[in-house]
């Protein structure tokens, strides 16, 4: 109640302010009850008071959790919106962030809280009007009784926690992945239809892709095969680059320039290296390109290398399924208004591979052409743009939970406000 009175002096009116007036009306009515020997409205007021205290506790817990997340942070990354990013949709991209992005917005009242304040003020004025009219007709005692009763009836008790409860539940979930939302402005900015770019390090962080072994075919020397294939993979980019660069270093071979590079988009790439046509890709890709594959070379996850139309090597690759990446991708694919856009340079990350690896439905995942990918990768958020959410970990699940959680919070808070307005 003191918070409510303090808000009035600051030029704001909220549910706690209405609760303070309700307390005064109930106290005056209780004094009349002693004289008239009737039961006051103490039970109903105690229920509203309990809910108001619960809302304050939840808000306090949310703020402490957010501060604790930022306190433990080593590096901050922000989620910023870029207009007209892909297919007419804005993009939610990650960039640098500062603590001020959160501190400037976290204490601002949200849209549901503003609606609550307007509703509380209107309810107070209407209740006073009804009480004055009743007092003029039936006396002051009945007017006070009607004022106290109408104020209690005007606001459902659960209205106090219609926003703070969903926010507290979401904060606990975000705290586990090291993420905070930048106030209601961040919630609004993360809502609506948007594209979410996914890079190689999002799906398979550094160290999750390893070389399990290699088998060479034909008469070419292994060093020559490694040099040609590694050069082509370096030109393609992606998570395989560190693996093959380490292989080149171990064999003490040099990288060569690549000409006529081409990404076929079906799990394979090609180009000319030292005047030799080189093809790299999955087993099905090389077979479709007319390369003869000997029997007994069936490997589930492998890069097949063909030079001048002849199979020269099979590199067995291990893609470790990280729980954070899997949880983030599943979460993004579960929201219709979010469109994941694959910007990975790794040609092995095809639609079929992602479906089998992560068990997600890929019909909503977009696989743009190489030219479009390069254009999107070069787009950077405005340095002056405020961050909508801040993540403290380099994990896909941290950003994904912020996006989907903000949408769920806005829906829950809006629905709760509408229901309580109708109920009041």
Go through each PLM region and give its residues.
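Hydrophobic alpha-helical transmembrane segments
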Residues: 1, 29, 45-74, 80-195, ...
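C-terminal ends of transmembrane helices
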Residues: 2-7
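Cytoplasmic-side transmembrane-helix entry/capping segments in multi-pass membrane proteins
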Residues: 9-20
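Hydrophobic alpha-helical transmembrane segments in multi-pass integral membrane proteins
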Residues: 25-35
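Loop-to-transmembrane alpha-helix initiation sites
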Residues: 34-46
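ATP-binding catalytic core of ATPases
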Residues: 112, 218-266
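Asp-based phosphoryl-transfer active-site loop
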Residues: 186-213
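Signature of the cytosolic headpiece of P-type E1-E2 ATPases
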Residues: 250-354
């Amino acid at each position: 109640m003191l918070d409510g009175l303090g808000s009035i002096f600051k030029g704001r009116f909220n549910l706690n302010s209405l609760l303070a007036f309700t307390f005064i009306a109930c106290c005056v009515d209780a004094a009349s009850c002693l004289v008239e020997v009737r039961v006051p409205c103490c039970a109903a007021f105690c229920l509203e008071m309990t809910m108001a205290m619960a809302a304050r506790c939840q808000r306090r817990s949310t703020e402490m959790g957010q501060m604790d997340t930022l306190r433990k942070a080593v590096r901050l990354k922000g989620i910023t919106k870029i207009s007209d990013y892909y297919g007419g949709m804005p993009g939610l991209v990650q960039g640098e962030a500062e603590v001020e992005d959160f501190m400037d917005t976290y204490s601002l009242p949200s849209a549901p809280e503003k609606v609550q304040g307007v509703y509380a003020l209107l309810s107070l004025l209407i209740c006073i009007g009804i009480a004055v009219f009743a007092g003029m007709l039936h006396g002051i005692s009945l007017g006070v009784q009607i004022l106290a009763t109408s104020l209690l009836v005007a606001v459902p008790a659960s209205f106090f926690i219609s926003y703070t409860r969903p926010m507290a539940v979401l904060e606990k979930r975000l705290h586990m992945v090291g993420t905070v939302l930048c106030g209601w402005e961040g919630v609004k900015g993360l809502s609506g239809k948007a594209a979410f770019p996914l890079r190689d390090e999002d799906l398979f962080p550094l160290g999750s892709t390893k070389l399990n072994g290699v088998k060479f075919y034909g008469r070419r020397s292994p060093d020559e095969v490694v040099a040609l294939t590694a050069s082509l993979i370096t030109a393609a980019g992606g998570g395989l680059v560190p693996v093959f660069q380490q292989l080149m270093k171990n064999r003490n071979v040099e990288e060569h320039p690549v000409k006529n590079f081409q990404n076929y988009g079906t799990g394979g790439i090609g180009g000319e290296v030292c005047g030799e046509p080189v093809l790299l890709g999955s087993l099905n890709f090389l077979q479709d390109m007319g390369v003869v594959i000997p029997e007994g070379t069936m490997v589930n996850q492998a890069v097949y290398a063909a030079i001048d139309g002849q199979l020269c090597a099979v590199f067995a690759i291990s893609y470790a399924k990280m729980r954070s990446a899997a949880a983030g991708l599943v979460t993004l694919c579960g929201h219709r208004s979010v469109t994941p856009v694959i910007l990975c340079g790794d040609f092995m990350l095809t639609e079929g591979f992602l479906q089998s690896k992560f068990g997600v439905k890929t019909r909503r995942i977009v696989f743009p052409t190489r030219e479009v990918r390069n254009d999107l990768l070069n787009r950077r958020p405005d340095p002056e743009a405020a961050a909508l959410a801040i993540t403290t970990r380099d994990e896909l699940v941290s950003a994904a939970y912020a996006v989907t959680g903000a949408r769920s919070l806005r829906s829950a808070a809006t629905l709760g406000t509408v229901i309580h307005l109708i109920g009041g």
